[in-house]
Amino acid sequence: MSEIKMPEFLTVESALKDSGLAVTPAELHGLLVGMISGGLPLDDNAWKPLMYDYTNDGLGWPDSAIQIGSAVFQFTVAELTGSELALSMLIPNDKEGLMNRADGLSEWVNHFISGLGLVDLKMDKASEALKEALVDLEEIARLGIDEDDDIEEQESLFEQVLEHVHVCVLTIHLELGQRIHKDASKAVH
């Protein structure tokens, strides 16, 4: 069986734009990770109706967007259910600059939280660790970069925040998400 790879940010961005969808790669991936971490069934069709409703007024996506969305979904499932429990984030890379990366992270986190809501997260049964992780993510979603501050310090702080987002998301996924998938270890990082 072939290895599953995450499509490149620019490839996803182009496919979404060419399809006329007003969703960024970070938003798409954040929604998918949120839905998966919230307990969405792991088959390749479960995400589609929710995504269509959220991003396209309930209308289906063009085939090219479905293909790219499915590739992102399959990679994400493989990562989150694999033995290494990893999380790659589909946000702009280092070459895109700190402001773009920070905006992408904010989009990703906001849509992760929305993805949890789409699968009807029940907070009354959530552990304290999950509640704390969600509060942290809500605060992180509102953070911004101050262009007047030392850019190197801002870069360092961004990396710390990015790592904390990983911890929060994995904490939530471990509590609510589906367990090991038999082909999950095929993801390439």
From Swiss-Prot:
Source taxon at top rank: Bacteria
InterPro entries noted in UniProt: YgfB-like (IPR011978), YgfB-like_sf (IPR036255)
Bilayer-spanning residue ranges: none
Disulfide bond entries: none
Pfam families given in the database record: UPF0149 (PF03695)
Any one annotated GO CC term: cytosol
Similarity remark: Belongs to the UPF0149 family.
Database matches in PANTHER family: UPF0149 PROTEIN YGFB
Protein name: UPF0149 protein VSAL_I2539
Organism: Aliivibrio salmonicida (strain LFI1238) (Vibrio salmonicida (strain LFI1238))
